[in-house]
Amino acid sequence: VISQVLAAVGLILCCTGGVLHLQARREKDRRRSDAAAEAAAGTATRLQLSIDLLRRAHPDQVADTTFSVGQLQVLIIGGTIIALFLVASVHLTIMVLVGAVILLYLASLAVRLRLFRLGLDQDALVQIDDRTARAFPDSRLPTYTVLVPAYGEPEVFGRLVENLRALEYPREKLEIMLLLEADDTETISAARKAVGDVLDFSVVLVPAAEPRTKPKALNYGLIKARGDLVAVYDAEDRPDPLQLRKAAMVLADAPADVACVQAKLGFFNPNQNLITRWFTLDYRMWFGELLPGLVRLRAPIPLGGTSNHFRRTVLLEVGAWDAFNVTEDADLGIRLYRAGYRTGVLDSITLEEANSDLVNWVKQRSRWYKGYAQTLLVHLRQPDRFRREIGLRPLLLTCLFVGGTPMLAVLNSFFWGCVIVWFIFQPHFFREVLPTLTYFLGMISWIGGNAVILYTWLLSARRAEDKLVIAAILSPLYWILMAMAATKAAVQLITAPSYWEKTQHGLDHGSAEEPGSAAAA
């Protein structure tokens, strides 16, 4: 009887244990399912937020449409007026239009020359030597998040991780996020292999969704970021190892209205071919003279796409990056200025890969030109409000510099073409639409403008080696490439405004020149 009772009790306990185990497993599965659903919901929320960050802060400054209703009305009315004048007098209308274009061209050239001359004085740059940077106490350094978006470039990650690990910053205060598209399996695999078990690196997968742009990925990473400061690097970058410390020092001691520090950019393969030499000179002027010139004039700074260092709170306040703008950097720089913040230019160099392939270069440059036009159109949707926020002079500087960059590329080739046609064919039509005053203005624009551009290139190259001086002399050929890129940008601005043409990297064949070389701006 006792044995039967014990057997019955054992059977009951066994059944009860089985039921409890089954319930526990179901509860575990439910929690796992709930966690997965919560994670999926969190991912979806972060994705939508990464697209809408700017829309929530400034819905009128999102570049999801090329022209606002008001701008379309101006275009239609302006086009109608020009058409009516053409009907009344073709020659007079063309003469006036050509004269207006010449004056606009001269104004843009004058602005660039003024910025160049101001930028030659390196006092506009924030300069911190390596010894001072290393002496800055670690205890005063803030936490830092480094965002590195990448797509379709698995070959760069070995070098990338090596370059970022060389950054001299307390590891406990540093987090580095590699922002990768979730369906880019080859790049994800390469990144995870390169990162290994390095604690301050994390691979963040950005869900595949439109718009598939760098700024959307940056926003996705920013939402997860924990650092007080945020830096952006590209996947092929080789930053100055002390750049984070230097930027942190600047932002620690600067007034609260200094929200961003832009480091200078150069190339590690400047002498690979003629295109890379031209590109190097281009960067030398942009980061070495033109941006410092803007700093001295206290004008808006169109940021470069990498080596930007921000206060995270300010970045979130202004809406971060526009997910639809293909030059989100230039747009953000202007938006910071509109919000009352300033940008400094730091004399610390990040080396990039200079584009050495002609087709690849045109793709990249046309995206930049398209983005500059996008940016200007966005900020001119409400021109009177824009003027009130930043002032008349900064507004004119922004229009002539940001808008003038692609405009000069097109008009320079237009003037060259007109002069060539005139000297070869001397068409009677030119005599009718180009009276003496307009003709001489045009000649001044062509001869004087090209002389000024060539002079600035030669001056920028004078401290470099002879190969860059020769490239500067041959720069008129580079202007033809610029015109091609600007024309392509104008077409894409209408047909595919938010399309991000990927720049192919890894074409440098292992070049590794030192920061003190001609690559440095």
Per-range role (PLM):
Residues L84-R114, L118-G119, L125-I128, F136, ...:
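Membrane-embedded multi-pass helical conduit in multi-pass membrane proteins
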Residues A110-V146, A150-E172:
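N-terminal signal-anchor transmembrane helix
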Residues P142-T145, E175, L316, D331:
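Cell-envelope/extracellular polymer assembly enzymes that use nucleotide-activated donors
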Residues R165-A209:
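Acidic donor-binding segment of Leloir-type glycosyltransferases
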Residues K193-L229, P241-V326, L358, V362, ...:
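Long helical/loop segments within the catalytic core of UDP-sugar-dependent glycosyltransferases
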Residues V326-L332:
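Acidic donor-binding loop at a coil-to-helix junction in glycosyltransferase catalytic cores
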Residues G333-L351:
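Catalytic donor-sugar/metal-binding loop of nucleotide-sugar-dependent glycosyltransferases
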